[in-house]
Amino acid sequence: MDIIEESGFKFDTGPTIVMMPDIYKKPFIDSGVDYKNYFKMKRINPFMDVVTQNKKIALSSDLVDLAKEFESYDESEMLGFLKYLTDIYSKYINAKNNFIYKSFRGPSDFYNIKTLWNAYKLKTFSSSFEAIQKNIKNTDLQYLMSFQTLYIGISPFSGPSIYNIIPMIELIYGVWFIKGGMFQYAKALEKRFIELGGKIVYNSTVEKIIVKNNKHVSGLLINNTLKDCDAVVANADFPYTMTHLLDMDDNKKDKLC
């Protein structure tokens, strides 16, 4: 996440739009402050125009406006859309409560009747496009509700149906823009962290997380200098942390995975 400034213009080098805005507000609310004093958000609605061979569709998170678009094809398409929305929202709640926000620290945490049953209910065996076809019959609308898997580089024709959560999130929670760009959110987090007594060390490369006896974190190797510590929160990608940062035996890493 960074910003490029040129000739009075600002460009985000990473993501620009925000989905699920409550996640961005939560660190500030949890630390006892009003997030509006740190950053501003603006809802984008409609959040995109989709141009098909036949017409232009304004994609909106306002259900009344969206209903008009679907009903302009056929009333049955709106009924199918509501069935789709109900189905994928129930899967989202299942995934969030039983998988996304749950820690799996051992085999028994996953391999039990309750968890396996919840995994089955996600019904990820069909592709995203096939799942949409069950409820929405018009070709334009099928493509309209399925291309969002491309956000994460997955084809709707081969990716599992669970990725239909992405357009559902857009439609239910809306699409938002942080005023000043996404980098403004990083500055807001920095400000609040420092207010709480935190210290940020800039322009430093973490080379290794030192683990004593393959059991306990004892330090960080930063710019070829050892810094003592007894706990580390690694925000890098998990595979990168395991293969490049964690200084411990490979067989111990396998057990952590």
Regions found by a protein language model. Name each.
Residues 1-93:
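N-terminal glycine-rich phosphate/pyrophosphate-binding loop and immediately adjacent elements
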Residues 13, 143-145, 202, 222, ...:
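General beta-strand structural signal in soluble alpha/beta enzymes
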Residues 49, 56, 198-199, 219-220, ...:
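Beta-sheet entry/capping signal
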Residues 53-159:
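Rossmann-like flavin
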Residues 116-130, 169-191, 201-203:
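Short beta-strand to alpha-helix junction loop
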Residues 159-170:
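Residues forming anionic-ligand binding surfaces in small-molecule and nucleic-acid pockets
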Residues 179-187, 191, 195, 209-210, ...:
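Glycine-rich loop(s) and the adjacent beta-strand/alpha-helix scaffold that form part
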Residues 199-218:
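A conserved short coil-to-beta-strand element within the FAD-binding core of flavoproteins
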